[in-house]
């Protein structure tokens, strides 16, 4: 915090400018001195500043800053605004900060229904199993009899129903983070190596991996299963999660078989 404040302060930057201008006025050796001082300063920064990757690209790095400390945040942004070049402010936050149930289970509160504030539990009673519930149970059952079956997701193990699989078969579960393209290409590599990958992803998010589905999986005619959650109209997740384009953009791809179960029984059979 101290270093970030010092480096972004008016006094420090003005002093740095004046020193450089003064040294440059020295005949013959002035420019060389400025360069050597700059290199020495950069070497020291490499040791003490975590954001040197950005500094090396000419972007001033400020942080890390506690994103829940409003006073520090305001001060840091004011300091950044005073600079006349690119600045990156690194802010650290904790999802659900200040509400114990959300801090304990942040993914549960990523998208929520009405819930009891005291307990954090949903007020919506679950009467029937969902497609996600059935997929979650079935994929674990299939993995029992097929040791080659592996599961891939892009930072959505809960939403896609792979949470149970990740606990039952941690060595066969791969979460690649928010990178659908990488999830698809990784699955292609697994299939080429003889595994049976199942990529569980939201329908609208698979759009980001369209080129990989086409080029890395289907043109290679590799055996990869794409289990698309939130296919069709899904009102509760908002307009960005409506999976209304998958049939269109997947049906034009060669070596692709598309199945759309109309009920839970069909879903189980199609997975088999």
Walk through the language-model features, giving the residues of each:
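Acidic, Ser/Thr-rich peripheral helices and adjacent loops at domain boundaries
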Residues: 2-21, 108-114, 247-248
